[in-house]
């Protein structure tokens, strides 16, 4: 039964980045392992990862993946923080993926975006993540205590 189901699936393409995201700098191999494990647990057919360019604020590989989204059931990445920071660009990418019948999976947040309604929730989550990472945490250093 699982073999027949796997044969009808287009599969899930993994997207990784060498850049830091959401305050993390995670090696590509660890990202790929995380994505593969997620797909195995969810019963998704895993396709090897693609790697984004190192150049900051460019998404050439992601854009290429968007153009081929109809070839997959889903695209999986570690975090919503891997998407472009610019809301209009992010919304355009996600909408074009959804329009091709493809879902977006985010393993750290454990969410799947499969509809425009989910896009609204995704935008709220991205706003919260951006807010939380922009806040400076107070330091409790003994060096700062006057003697």
Question: How would you name each of these model-derived features?
Answer:
Residues 1-147:
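Short, structured surface patches at the beginning of a domain
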């Amino acid at each position: 039964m699982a073999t027949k189901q796997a044969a009808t699936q287009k599969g899930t393409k993994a997207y990784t980045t060498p850049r830091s995201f959401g305050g993390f700098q995670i090696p590509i191999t660890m990202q790929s392992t995380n994505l593969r494990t997620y797909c195995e647990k969810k019963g998704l057919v895993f396709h090897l990862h693609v790697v984004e360019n190192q150049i900051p604020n460019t998404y050439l590989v992601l854009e290429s993946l968007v153009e081929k989204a109809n070839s997959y059931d889903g695209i999986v990445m570690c975090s919503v923080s891997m998407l472009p920071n610019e809301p209009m660009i992010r919304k355009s990418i996600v909408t074009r993926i959804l329009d091709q019948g493809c879902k977006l999976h985010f393993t750290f947040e454990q969410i799947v975006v499969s509809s425009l309604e989910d896009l609204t929730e995704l935008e709220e989550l991205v706003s919260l993540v951006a807010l939380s990472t922009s806040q400076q945490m107070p330091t409790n250093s003994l060096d700062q205590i006057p003697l």
